[in-house]
Regions:
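Cytosolic, membrane-interface loops and tails of multi-pass inner-membrane proteins
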Residues: 16-30, 71, 75-79, 135-159
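Helix-coil boundary and interhelical linker segments in multi-pass alpha-helical membrane proteins
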Residues: 1-5, 46-61, 103-123
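Alpha-helical membrane-inserting segments
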Residues: 13, 17, 47-51, 67-78, ...
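Alpha-helical transmembrane segments of multi-pass membrane proteins, especially transporters
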Residues: 7, 11, 36-40, 60, ...
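Multi-pass membrane catalytic core of lipid/isoprenoid biosynthesis enzymes
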Residues: 31-55, 62, 88-103
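Alpha-helical transmembrane segments of multi-pass integral membrane proteins
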Residues: 90-107, 119-140
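Membrane-interface helix-loop-helix junctions at boundaries between adjacent transmembrane segments
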Residues: 70-93
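Hydrophobic, membrane-facing alpha-helical anchors
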Residues: 2-21, 71-73, 122-136
Length: 159
């Protein structure tokens, strides 16, 4: 369970906090030619290794990063403006599925160095973070089709 939480935290940090919107736009525009796609994949690998903190997990982290690259590559090639929501949700579902599978398959080779208190704290931090940044990004993305209709530009900028 704790490995799943670590991998989920690594994913959320890498996909939401450490990936600027400019990178997402560059990936959509330049597809496989975007250096941002490769940097994003490398960040996933590094953050996963830092959070798991076990060198024997390097093969699994490589697998996660490689599948993340392929999934993001498919997404940028096949999504269109009208299908962005569907591809975003499918992309996230694929990433979470990979995390679940890796957490299950790798349990026999990964040893956690954290005591129980730290496991609880890590779970709590991951849960709280999930409720802030990633969930708000998902909600904003899902309701984006209606925000342009309800926007009122008669206010102060950034107010």
């Amino acid at each position: 369970m704790i490995l799943f939480v670590k991998l989920l935290l690594a994913h959320m940090l890498s996909d939401f906090l450490l990936q600027p919107n400019s990178w997402v736009e560059a990936k959509e525009k330049n597809k496989l030619k975007a250096w941002q796609l490769y940097a994003h994949t490398f960040i996933h690998f590094i953050i996963t290794m830092l959070i798991v903190w076990d060198l024997s997990f390097i093969l699994w982290a490589t697998i996660i990063a490689a599948i993340h690259f392929v999934t993001d590559g498919f997404k940028v090639f096949f999504q269109f403006e009208k299908s962005r929501r569907v591809w975003f949700l499918a992309d996230q579902a694929m990433h979470i599925s990979v995390i679940v599978i890796v957490a299950i398959w790798s349990q026999n080779i990964v040893i956690s160095f954290y005591p129980k208190l730290n496991e609880y704290y890590l779970f709590l931090v991951t849960f709280v973070y999930a409720l802030t940044q990633p969930v708000s990004a998902m909600i904003r993305f899902i309701i984006s089709r209606w925000t342009s209709v309800t926007e009122n530009n008669d206010s102060l900028e950034n107010a």
